[in-house]
């Protein structure tokens, strides 16, 4: 199924995923497309931050759902 990931810059990334995919898997796919390391990614759906070990099905994320990607930047100001 396809889902969409919207970044803070307003860009929308389309991903091909399965309901059984873990959030880790989704972050790896985002890394493949965008080059953003998974440890800097925070995914939000329906106002909730998604935990790495859970699956898309756990959060009732269905086809054509839109997730929001927030970057967690490391250290320094």
Curated annotation (Swiss-Prot):
The keyword Protein biosynthesis does not apply. Belongs to the ubiquitin family. CDD domains: Ubl_ubiquitin (cd01803). Keywords: Cytoplasm, Isopeptide bond, Nucleus, Ubl conjugation. Pfam families: ubiquitin. Ubiquitin exists either covalently attached to another protein, or free (unanchored). When covalently bound, it is conjugated to target proteins via an isopeptide bond either as a monomer (monoubiquitin), a polymer linked via different Lys residues of the ubiquitin (polyubiquitin chains) or a linear polymer linked via the initiator Met of the ubiquitin (linear polyubiquitin chains). Polyubiquitin chains, when attached to a target protein, have different functions depending on the Lys residue of the ubiquitin that is linked: Lys-48-linked is involved in protein degradation via the proteasome. Residues 1-76 form the Ubiquitin-like domain. SUPFAM superfamilies: Ubiquitin-like (SSF54236). There is a cross-link at residue 48 (Glycyl lysine isopeptide (Lys-Gly) (interchain with G-Cter in ubiquitin)). It comes from the Eukaryota. There is a cross-link at residue 76 (Glycyl lysine isopeptide (Gly-Lys) (interchain with K-? in acceptor proteins)). InterPro entries: Ubiquitin-like_dom, Ubiquitin-like_domsf, Ubiquitin_CS, Ubiquitin_dom, Ubiquitin_ubiquitin-like. GO terms for cellular component: cytoplasm; nucleus. This is Ubiquitin. Its main location: cytoplasm. GO terms for molecular function: mRNA binding. Residues 77 form a propeptide. It is found in: Cytoplasm; Nucleus. It comes from Helianthus annuus (Common sunflower).
